[in-house]
Amino acid sequence: VLSASDKANVKAVFGKIGGQAEEFGAETLERMFATYPQTKTYFPHFDLGKGSAQVKGHGKKVAAALVEAANHVDDIAGALSKLSDLHAQKLRVDPVNFKLLGQCFLVVVASHNPALLTPEVHASLDKFLCAVGTVLTAKYR
């Protein structure tokens, strides 16, 4: 459960990275594919090379979902309901991959904004990303 302080920290992070969210989304995917190559199996039709238009396009979708969740931090489940349905019923992405993606996103945020990611903010952002992952896997059976 995100506290009021966690919610404020999450909103502050997304306020700070706002204009870079799409780039962060693509960089997060690139990092995930390089660090956890097994995640590539969900994208057999993608050019997964660095700077790929397809990775950038999907990174934009990832970023949009995270921004949407941050903008609706009091109702992440409602904000991501359709995306949860898609991942559970059609794409059937292994739930562990959401955790891996979240870890990579934390690294990207930290690498670009080291002063922003204090221990408290890091903990809040990690809790938020775990909440997003929980929502995205809630409809799995």
From Swiss-Prot:
Red blood cells. It comes from the Eukaryota. Belongs to the globin family. The keyword Secreted does not apply. Gene3D superfamilies: Globins. Involved in oxygen transport from the lung to the various peripheral tissues. O2 binds at residue 58. GO terms for biological process: hydrogen peroxide catabolic process. Heterotetramer of two alpha chains and two beta chains. Heme b binds at residue 87. Pfam families: Globin. Residues 1-141 form the Globin domain. Keywords: Heme, Iron, Metal-binding, Oxygen transport, Transport. InterPro entries: Globin, Globin-like_sf, Globin/Proto, Hemoglobin_a-typ, Hemoglobin_oxygen_transport, Hemoglobin_pi. One of its GO terms (molecular function) is organic acid binding. GO terms for cellular component: blood microparticle; haptoglobin-hemoglobin complex; hemoglobin complex. This is Hemoglobin subunit alpha-A. It comes from Sturnus vulgaris (Starling). The keyword Transport applies.
